Amino acid sequence: MHPSLATRQNWLVDRMFSAVPGIAHIIVNPGFFADNYLRLIGFAAQLGIFPMPTGESRNAPPSNEDIASMVVAALIDPARHAGKSYRPTGPALLSARDMAAILGRVLSRRVRHIDMPMWMFLKAARTLGLSVFEQSGVRRYIEEHKRGAFELGAPTDDILEVTGQAPEDFETIARRYAALPEAQCSFANAWRTWVDFMRIGLTSAYDLDRYEREQNHPLLAHPQLAVDSDVWRVEHGVKPQSGEAGFGRAGAAPETVEAM
């Protein structure tokens, strides 16, 4: 079973809806999408750094707008999409280093990827306001990312198939984020970002294992990441590997779209 409670719950919800008669059940599974990276636009714009603990692993992240367009299209014509599972992606696989280069081009400055360790990432996540609940799931998805889960079967043409429009590339998405107030060059923004950066070292990370125990999350004897699950691989059109099959969907929890 997947170590993320949210992933296990969504996997079960997907199957519950698929078993209910009279419901057009459609799965939209965006994985790890572009907004997760571009929350760091302020650090890139003001300090020239892109801290992301994903190593050289790659992803083809979709935009929020493309995900929303896919959901709307599915709701408008549920009969066409009933029983299908879609994985929206961007058009190209990118590493964090690739993304940093694109951000540098968009921001007209050098941006360097920093492959920060997980313990530092969790301190930074708390500094930036990510809740303990979100972090308990995100740490698992970062593990999936580093193992290459989001590279498998990507990119897809699902956005084009469902919406009739090609997916936005990362540079197009990044330019939209670069227009946000926190990405503009100013003394106030630079000072605020520098203070946030310094706060990371002074901030204690949440004890996520303790949090999960206190919330009575089921403790798994043999947790299994999605990338190691034959069931997940089959569901995502990827060749299974040997070993006991588990279940789960990598990345952010899938959105379930229902229409009567």
Question: Which role does the model predict for each range below?
Answer:
Residues 95-107, 173:
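PAPS/PAP-binding and catalytic site of the sulfotransferase fold
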Residues 53-57, 86-93, 107-108, 115, ...:
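Glycine-rich Rossmann NAD(P)(H)-binding loop
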Residues 103-150, 184-213:
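Terminal hydrophobic/aromatic helix or amphipathic segment near a protein terminus
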Residues 158, 166-260:
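Amphipathic terminal alpha-helices
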Residues 1-52:
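Glycine-/Pro-rich loop/turn segments that contact NAD(P) or position catalytic residues
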Residues 53-75, 84, 91, 95-98:
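Substrate-positioning beta->alpha
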Residues 36-46, 74-85:
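Glycine/proline-rich active-site loop of Rossmann-fold NAD(P)-dependent oxidoreductases
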Residues 71, 75, 103, 173-178:
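Hydrophobic "lid"/C-terminal helical patch
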